[in-house]
Design a protein with these regions (language model features):
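Core structural elements
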Residues: 223-227
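Alpha-helical scaffolds flanking conserved acidic
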Residues: 251-252
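Active-site substrate-binding loop specific to GH73 endo-beta-N-acetylglucosaminidase modules
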Residues: 1-221, 233-245, 255-276
Length: 276
């Protein structure tokens, strides 16, 4: 929404996308751990995006110009994909953040646990001025958790999404949502608590296996040109095990996919018929 976010223009949009592209490229080309995608101590910024983030160069000098440069992150409001403006913006609504979209994205794209589709006829949150001023987004979303049909999925999905409430709808850091205090704390379905985005990233990076499995499945899908099936599961698990034994290096992921049977041996019509 150009009225609510006048600083969001084509230059900022392009800078957001370039940061993510350069960051992923660095993980790949430098053969870094795939866990850097969850949290890292560096990113790539130009003047436009650095101003948006409120980040200076390590020497304290402002970052100047349109060219992107690698920047160390002395404080950890940023780091990894989850707190990059590109992801935070695409998982927001036009006028506000969306804990549901952000939580769903993290479950699907990071943890590999996509929630089921919502039941029919669930109303959207009212967006009129009176509703918005009546309480924080967390308070207004309590309606989802009061509906038994929504409660199970929204309990974890919303909690993960709320962890990113310190970032507004275009990914700028904030301490308050309007006049309301932000509470980014939550917990996973297993009861593990986190205090906000940094804590959430730390827990995901420590657990490692769910993200490694999720990324393996997505990379394998890309390599095969099809979705993974139940018969691919042993291959996925073998790749995850090899990743663990090799410090989760990106090159290990690529090499193991290329060496895998699903990649090397195309399933023919007869084989598929037998499987059915």
């Amino acid at each position: 929404d150009g009225v609510m976010f006048p600083n969001f223009d084509d230059r900022l949009r392009a800078a957001m996308l370039e940061e993510t592209s350069l960051f992923f490229e660095s993980v790949m080309r430098e053969d870094r751990s795939i866990m850097d995608l969850i949290d890292a101590d560096y990113t790539f910024l130009n003047e436009r995006l650095a101003n948006h983030y409120g980040i200076n160069a390590p020497d304290g000098e402002p970052i100047v110009g349109d060219a992107f440069r690698r920047v160390s992150l002395p404080e950890r409001q940023r780091g990894g994909l989850l707190t990059q403006a590109s992801v935070l913006t695409v998982t927001s609504n036009p006028t506000r953040t969306s804990p549901v979209k952000r939580g769903r994205w993290a479950l699907e794209q990071i943890l590999g646990e996509p929630p089921p589709p919502p039941p029919p006829d669930v109303p959207d949150l009212p967006e009129d001025e009176q509703a918005v001023s009546s309480g924080s987004i967390r308070e207004r979303m309590e309606m989802h958790r009061k509906n038994p049909a929504c409660a199970n999925c929204h309990r974890e999905m919303d909690a993960i999404g709320f962890a990113f409430e310190n970032y507004d709808a275009i990914g700028a850091y904030r301490e308050k949502d309007g006049r309301f205090e932000i509470d980014p704390a939550g917990e996973f379905a297993d009861g593990t608590r986190f205090r906000g985005a940094q804590d959430l990233k730390r827990i995901i990076a420590q657990r490692r296996t769910p993200f490694a499995r999720c990324l393996t499945e997505k990379m394998l899908t890309y390599a095969l040109g099809r979705g993974t099936e139940s018969y691919d599961r042993p291959v996925v698990e073998r790749i995850v095990g090899t990743l663990e034994a090799n410090e989760y290096r990106f090159s290990t992921l690529v090499a193991e996919i290329v060496k895998s049977d699903p990649f090397r041996k195309r399933r023919g019509a007869a084989t598929l018929a037998d499987a059915e």
